Amino acid sequence: MVSLFMINNTFRLTLMALTFAGGYVTSAPTQAATNVLSDKAETIEKVNTKNIALSGVIKQGGLIVGKTLPSDTVKLNGKTLMVSAKGDYTFGFSRDDKQSHKLVITSINGDRVEKILIPEQREYNIQRIEGIKKSIMQPKPKAAIRARKDSTQVKAARKIASSLDYFAQGFIPPIEGTITGVYGSQRVYNGVPKNPHFGLDYAGNTGDPVKAPASGTVLLWVPDMFYSGGTMIIDHGQGVSSTFLHLSDSYVKKGDKVTQGQVVAAVGQSGRATGPHLDWRINWFDVRIDPALVLELQPLKTVQH
């Protein structure tokens, strides 16, 4: 059930979640996200049904965080998700996700609850540029080999499924600065689409401090990748990771534990960057998540039955 209510003269969309218990149905209102990127999305923040509590935005690029009993089994589209000792789990939607997702939670005594999630589709900024020389668009053979090696390292780091649950505690911006690039935008050169931009770009000056948006473990630090220059990946748990690109320096190393708000690196313009800035990316394994939507996540309270 969906309803509208007014707060401070602004209409908010409220999802009424059904709770099934002993043959009756109750409803619990939710608070919609305030970020302009999710105004039209179905937003779940502390939506509770029996054994279901979720926070996030059901939207392409959205990350969902759930909480249940640690003994419960959680499946998304038939695939079992990790559940932490505190009952936290997570999953996300890709940039172009158009499918219906089935979330199933089964308790230790066999009780089962299902929810269908369909991410809202988004429109992205597409820029078309003609007349670019082919020599500019294609890297030299040696550079291409190096770029593939870099990509292999990054993909390996993002496959790690640790038992950490820092993703469930919320995220903060890694830097205070003007946003100059957004998730999902794409350029088409001479009629050929290039890879979309999957990060959130912040303007900055070389040397500006970069903070950990959430606690975690440093999975990767390489100072000189071909495209992304100084590249750092921090594991926040269960496949959720932050990636920082174009860094000028790192104050931590692979394997270090970091806490939310800790200064871990410095802004730069390394790699193929036209000026100093921070490119912050979020992944759920190989699923590219919109960092702007992640900033809206709210921690969930312990589930009790």
Predicted regions and their residues:
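Cationic-aromatic interfacial patches
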Residues: 2, 7-8, 29-122
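Sec-dependent signal peptide recognition
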Residues: 8-17
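Surface-exposed, glycine-biased beta-strand/turn segments
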Residues: 116-228
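Small beta-strand-rich domains/subdomains or short beta-sheet motifs embedded
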Residues: 203, 209-213, 244-245, 255-258, ...
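Short, well-structured beta-strand-loop connectors
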Residues: 209-220, 251-267
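Zn2+-dependent peptidoglycan hydrolase active-site motif and core
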Residues: 213-248, 276-281
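Extended, charge-rich intrinsically disordered regulatory tails
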Residues: 256-276, 280-305
